[in-house]
């Protein structure tokens, strides 16, 4: 029993690792535990050292992954007969027990669990599983990383499985990613491999050039003017008395004498420079004076008065023409302004009745000629 251990009813109450052994007694708890590879636990079981296992800590732990082997010391993998390899996973009789070569291939054992297959003409692969089909016969024609597929060589024809961004029978065509015109606002689309990029014009940004840059962000307007953003430009709404692109100019106050009076454009008057200045290199310069020529409105009809006159004359002419037309229409229908004989009241009778109207051009009360007596049954009206 190791020193430092206290045994009670075959239970080791305390065991210090590395303690030396003493002669065992019959009642020691070490009678059922390999004390060279472990010690007794408080529950009466053996507590094994690292690399050992078992009920009595009598068995070493093999290397992880060891399949057909054993060990004499921890972490070993000693292969059983017929097996080889680091993990004892190679069958030394694989050529006879498993026949790994297909399609008539011959298996050759290389030792250490390794083998190779001698394939018949037209087949290839580690196990001669692949036939020299259309892909191999065509020299693997798929381009741009495309994968040639022919069902392990047993298909009649090959097909190319293209990577993203390519198309065609041999994956030889680069798909135009700019075909759908993804770039906005007149941007230039640059095609890539399964991607595109937009070259934005000035004033725009973003992947698709859809973001209008704020030209007012730098606050270019002065005098407290309000800035209005445009496409790659801006406008300043200047307060009264200021002008210019950024309201940097102070406008002169208007002359009260010229307010409301149409003015002609200002004219530049060139006046030769005069004075007693000594002659120098700049003596030949001209003095330019800008004077504003104001022309007052001459007497006569203005534009608005002329328009009103034309409209009034047109309405008057239309009214006169309508009166003449109505008068002519009434005259053609035989309507007399005076006299009942020209417009008799409607009379309904079972028989026909003729009536003749005689109009005299003589003054009222003038007797008719005796030679023209009225006809019987006729009515004479003066």
Curated annotation (Swiss-Prot):
UniProt domain EGF-like: residue ranges: 27-58, 62-89, 91-129, 131-172, 174-210, 212-248
Record keyword Membrane present: yes
Molecular function terms, GO-annotated: calcium ion binding; identical protein binding; Notch binding
Keyword Zinc: no
SUPFAM superfamilies given in the database record: EGF/Laminin
Any one annotated GO CC term: membrane
Signal peptide: 1-26
Protein's UniProt name: Protein delta homolog 2
């Amino acid at each position: 029993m190791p020193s430092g251990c206290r045994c009670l009813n075959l239970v080791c109450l305390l065991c210090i690792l590395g303690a030396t052994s003493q002669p065992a007694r019959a009642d020691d708890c070490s009678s059922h535990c390999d004390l060279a590879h472990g010690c007794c636990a408080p529950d009466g079981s053996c507590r094994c050292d690292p690399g050992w296992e078992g009920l009595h800590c009598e068995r070493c732990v093999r290397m992880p992954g060891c399949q057909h082997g054993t060990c004499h010391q921890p972490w070993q993998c000693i292969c059983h007969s017929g097996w080889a390899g680091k993990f004892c996973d190679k069958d030394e009789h694989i050529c006879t027990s498993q026949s790994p070569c297909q399609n008539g291939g011959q298996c050759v054992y290389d030792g250490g669990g390794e083998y190779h297959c001698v394939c018949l003409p037209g087949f290839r692969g580690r196990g001669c599983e692949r036939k020299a089909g259309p892909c191999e016969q065509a020299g693997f024609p798929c381009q741009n990383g495309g994968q040639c597929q022919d069902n392990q060589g047993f298909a009649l024809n090959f097909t190319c499985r293209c990577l993203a961004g390519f198309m065609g029978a041999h994956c030889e065509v680069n798909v135009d990613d700019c075909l759908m015109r993804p770039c906005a606002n007149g941007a230039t689309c640059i095609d890539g491999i399964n991607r595109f990029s937009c070259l934005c014009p000035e004033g725009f940004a973003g992947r698709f050039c859809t973001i209008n840059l704020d030209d007012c962000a730098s606050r270019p307007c002065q005098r407290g003017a309000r800035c209005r953003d445009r496409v790659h430009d801006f406008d300043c709404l200047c307060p009264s008395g200021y002008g210019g692109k950024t309201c940097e100019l102070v406008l002169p106050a208007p002359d009260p004498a010229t307010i409301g009076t149409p003015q002609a454009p200002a004219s530049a008057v060139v006046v030769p420079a005069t004075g007693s200045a000594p002659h120098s290199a700049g003596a030949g310069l001209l003095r330019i004076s800008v004077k504003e020529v104001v022309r007052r409105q001459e007497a006569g009809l203005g534009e608005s008065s002329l328009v009103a006159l034309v409209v009034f004359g047109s309405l008057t002419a239309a009214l006169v023409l309508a009166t003449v037309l109505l008068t002519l229409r009434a005259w053609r229908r035989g309507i007399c302004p005076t006299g009942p004989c020209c417009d008799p009241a409607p009379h309904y009778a079972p028989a026909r009745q003729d009536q003749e109207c005689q109009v005299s051009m003589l003054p009222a009360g003038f007797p008719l000629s005796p030679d023209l007596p009225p006809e019987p049954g006729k009515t004479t009206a003066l």
